[in-house]
Curated annotation (Swiss-Prot):
Reactions it catalyzes: 3-methyl-2-oxobutanoate + acetyl-CoA + H2O = (2S)-2-isopropylmalate + CoA + H(+)
Subunit structure: Homodimer.
Gene encoding the protein: leuA
Domain Pyruvate carboxyltransferase: 8-273
Superkingdom of origin organism: Bacteria
Pathway in which this enzyme or protein is active: Amino-acid biosynthesis; L-leucine biosynthesis; L-leucine from 3-methyl-2-oxobutanoate: step 1/4
Region (Regulatory domain): 408-540
Alphabetized HAMAP family for the sequence: LeuA_type1 (MF_01025)
NCBIfam families in alphabetical order: leuA_bact, PRK00915.1-3
Gene source species: Synechococcus sp. (strain CC9311)
InterPro entries: 2-IPM_HCS-like, 2-isopropylmalate_synth_dimer, AIPM/Hcit_synth_CS, Aldolase_TIM, LeuA/HCS_post-cat, LeuA_allosteric_dom_sf, LeuA_bact_synth, PYR_CT
Entry binding sites for Mn(2+): 17, 208, 210, 244
The protein's name in its UniProt record: 2-isopropylmalate synthase
Length: 540
């Protein structure tokens, strides 16, 4: 049997695989904020990025290793393909962390070998031990992944895993890269590895999976029963295509059904010892932070963290819950940190009180960003009677942005009505503080604002998404606007919140423009990386 740490290790890949969601690109400060909250959540491993892919990814992994990795904190991990350049860049990026891991991978399915890598099985069996050993020359903790393991020949998979462990891999990851397997199949795959890999007792079995058929969480739970002891997942289940296995669903499934899972760990059924190290009361806070910073809206009926997860519409259900919550609720909302979100902050509240509450919500702002956030808070307090945590989160998420933003919105003014042509006047300042003003007409006030901003910026783009949602209840609620722009096939998202949705739209558009400019101004590929080498993309 594989190594058993006595519980399930949670490997969070929100900052790597999660960021591969179209339009979910994060800047360095946003990644750092999420990493700090993941540490508070109690995950065991943070996969902070793919260092060789770009200078930005390298810098983010290095900064997280410096500021989040600690003796008592999570392992900081970077992803690397099975090549020396990737592995060296990864080693350099994670070096500042007291607990470091290199996660290297290569595809093992015949379809990937033939059409993507153009390599034989023999080639792969030669590459794997060489690259794992090379990674071990930098760190003691090496994880090896067999990309597309779910569609690989099991007998070949056993050979590859044995070779990786012999070369020094302490964790072997089994990815269902395209979300193809069913729970029974995936469980049998893990059982087969346990039975047929001679040295499997020297490594922890990890699993990674995508949700293309909606089975990722079910597959993982079956894998746990079969001996997997590390789960690679993302907050809110974000990720490539249909997403990844959702961290919050996995953790709470094992929390609520602990009596069911305990025997698979050799424990008494009634053992109260948690199956993960995750602090469940941090789940809601983490979910909201990731949603705010990525602009990826959580569907209302999403398990555990959706807006309706603890709502009851049916009269029969409402009656039962009022009599005893256990009649229709298997999870106490307080267990995942969901409480009354009204807070005692108002227009008389001071800067220190706001800072303290923001830190509780997972935001550690610089002095300058805190000043900006506090000014926005005071402005909102003058216009809105009650301030909630959701309001604060919406305010501050706007502040966590590129410090070298090229454009800053100075003025937005619109004129519209049932018998008027919608017109917008906007003033934009560049990085040198020079201001320019433009006016445009449009089909509506938001269209007119966007036309004016494009006229001033002169950055080619296509608006592919405009969405607005209410942050809280009430007619004085803030409107949270998300805008996505497309250029050269890449998506750039921006969002903002304001009681005036037209102003929020203007701010969100400028935020997206700044991301677009930052994303196209410099090299997106690591200087050492030959474009032809990118035939093996990190989507395992």
């Amino acid at each position: 049997m594989a190594k058993d740490p006595g519980r399930v290790l949670i490997f969070d890949t929100t900052l790597r695989d999660g960021e591969q969601s179209p339009g979910a690109s994060l800047n360095l400060e946003e990644k750092l904020a999420i990493a700090q909250q993941l540490a508070r959540l109690g995950v065991d491993v943070i996969e902070a990025g793919f260092p060789f892919a770009s200078p930005g990814d390298f810098a983010a992994v290095q900064r997280i290793a410096q500021q989040v990795g600690g003796e008592n904190g999570p392992i900081i991990c970077g992803l690397a393909r099975a090549s020396r350049g990737d592995i060296k860049a990864c080693a350099d990026a994670v070096a500042p962390a007291p607990k470091q891991r290199i996660h290297t991978f290569i595809a093992t399915s015949d379809i990937h070998l033939e059409h993507k890598l153009r390599k034989s099985r023999k080639d792969v069996l030669g590459i794997v031990p060489e690259m794992v050993a090379y990674a071990r020359s930098f760190v003691d903790d090496v994880e090896f992944s067999c990309e597309d393991a779910g569609r690989s020949d099991p007998e070949f998979l056993y050979e590859v895993i044995e070779a990786a462990i012999s070369a020094g891999a302490s964790t072997v990851n089994i990815p269902d890269t395209v979300g193809y397997t069913t729970p029974t199949e995936f469980g049998r795959l893990i059982e087969g590895i346990n039975r047929n890999v001679p040295n499997i007792d020297e490594a922890v079995i990890s699993v990674h999976g995508h949700n293309d058929l909606g089975l990722a969480v079910a597959n993982f739970l079956e894998a746990v029963k079969s001996g997997a002891r590390q789960l690679e997942c993302t907050v809110n289940g974000i990720g490539e295509r249909a997403g990844n296995a959702a961290l919050e669903e996995l953790v709470m499934a094992m929390h609520v059904r602990r009596r069911y899972f305990n025997p698979f760990f050799g424990r008494d059924e009634d053992s109260p010892t948690p199956l993960t190290a995750v602090r469940t009361e941090e789940i809601t806070k983490t979910s909201r932070l990731v949603s705010n910073l990525t602009g990826m809206v959580v569907q209302p009926n999403k398990a555990i963290v959706g807006a309706n997860a603890f709502a009851h519409e049916s009269g029969i259900h409402q009656d039962g819950v009022l009599k005893n919550r256990l009649t229709y609720e298997i999870v106490d909302a307080r267990t995942v940190g969901l409480t009354d979100n009204r807070i005692s902050l108002g227009k008389l509240s001071g800067r220190s009180a706001v800072r303290a509450r923001l830190e509780e919500l997972g935001y550690d702002l610089s002095r300058e960003d805190l000043d900006d956030a506090f000014a926005r808070f005071k402005d909102l307090a003058d216009r809105k009677r009650e301030i909630t945590d959701r309001d604060l989160e919406s305010i501050v998420s706007v502040q966590v942005q590129q410090p070298d933003a090229k454009y800053q919105l100075k003025l937005v003014q619109v004129s519209c009505g049932s018998s008027l042509q919608p017109t917008a006047t906007v003033t934009l300042a560049d990085e040198n503080g020079q201001e320019q003003t433009a006016a445009s007409v449009g089909t509506g006030p938001v269209d007119a604002v966007c036309r004016s901003l494009n006229q001033l910026a002169g950055e080619p783009n296509e608006l592919v998404e405009f969405s607005v949602k209410s942050v809280t209840e009430g007619i004085d609620a803030m409107g949270d606007v998300t805008i996505r722009l497309r250029r050269d096939g890449q998506l750039y998202s921006g969002h903002s919140a304001h009681t005036d949705v037209v102003v929020a739209a203007a701010e969100a558009f400028v935020n997206a423009l700044n991301r677009l400019v930052a994303g196209t101004a410099g090299p997106t590929i690591h200087p050492q990386l030959d474009m032809a080498q990118l035939d093996s993309s990190p989507v395992h």
